[in-house]
Amino acid sequence: MNLDFIKSKIAAVPDFPKPGIMFRDITPLLADPQGLRKTAEAMAQELKNKGIQPTIIAGTESRGFIFGVALAEVLGLGFVPVRKPGKLPRATYSVKYDLEYGSDSLEIHQDAFKVTDEVLVVDDLLATGGTAKATVDLIEKTQAKVAGLIFVMELDSLGGREVLAGYNVSALIKF
């Protein structure tokens, strides 16, 4: 797999956005001509290894769009964007979730999925799990099934995996 390559392209930026935070910057990975493809291929291999066979991909705004579309292309699947409020033109479901500094919301179209869909959630980072859990809650409002969640990287110490207990969660790189 391409995990060493992927990890080598994620820059560690200390004290961003505030002192004491080690920010993991994916822009070098995206800037590399092979970065996005190798990441999507590694995600596809992880799904194959775990026997996860989604019928459609959901990506969370905004970096989940990047990796979600790339993975959808590799797997030959469709892609559904999970958006911030007010960005989708038709009837939506909305879920509010808590952040460390307040709250936010996510939305999807009410007709985004069929009840028979096996939805894979894709995002760049699993930290506290709040955004991922809100995305799962949105998908379940449509009566579709969550096949699993996959992330480029996971910050183990923040407990996101525990928030998603009961779901099939994968991360390519753990910090």
Curated annotation (Swiss-Prot):
Pathway annotation: Purine metabolism; AMP biosynthesis via salvage pathway; AMP from adenine: step 1/1
Subcellular location: Cytoplasm
Keywords of this entry: Cytoplasm, Glycosyltransferase, Purine salvage, Transferase
A biological process term (GO) from this entry: adenine salvage
Pfam families: Pribosyltran (PF00156)
InterPro entries found in the cross-reference section: Ade_phspho_trans, PRibTrfase_dom, PRTase-like, UPRTase/APRTase
Gene3D superfamilies registered for this protein in UniProt: 3.40.50.2020
Subunit structure, as described in the record: Homodimer.
Family: Belongs to the purine/pyrimidine phosphoribosyltransferase family.
PANTHER family: ADENINE PHOSPHORIBOSYLTRANSFERASE
UniProt xrefs under NCBIfam families: apt, PRK02304.1-3, PRK02304.1-5
Designated name of the protein: Adenine phosphoribosyltransferase
Lineage: Bacteria, Pseudomonadati, Pseudomonadota, Gammaproteobacteria, Thiotrichales
Gene: apt
